[in-house]
Amino acid sequence: YDAFLRSFKRNVDVPHSFLLGAGASITSGIQSAYDCIWEWKKDIYLSKNINSAEFYKNYKNESVRKSIQNWLDNQGKYPLLDSAEEYSFYAEKAYPIADDRRKYFFSLIENKEPYIGYKLLCLLSEHNIVKSVWTTNFDGLIVRSAHQNRLTPIEITLDNSDRIYRNQSNKELLTIALISVYSIRTD
């Protein structure tokens, strides 16, 4: 941490880029992808085991997770625990209709405010220290924070990647989304 700060101080004349992961969203009150997966597993389990609702409400409880995972494993048609395909598989299984998935993800970010780290990135952008923020998050909080801090976010996604080739002016912050499968738009 201290070496990072020394390097950062030494290079204030060089524009920086930041990569944000799930931790930034979690500090703003948005649940992690891991928790989403377990919520979907719980919903699938409860739709097949209707009389189990009360015990399985707390899907963050380890014994509840073990019980649900045992049931899923015994079905023989679900991905292995912690496998790479769990996220997309369970999102589609829990919400096979794309608009339902969009509504689910929107419900996670609705009324959430960017935590202080987002505001700091915008402040650094105002002082031309940060020029771009790359993110694996679907929440749009860096864009919201840019608006709140009188910056113009230039949103770049996998669908409009050609926008990255542009002259960037002051008061703009490039926000590059590295995901698209279950991203949502809130406008």
Q: What is the predicted role of each segment?
A:
Residues Y1-D187:
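Conserved catalytic-core helix/loop/strand module for nucleotide-ribose chemistry
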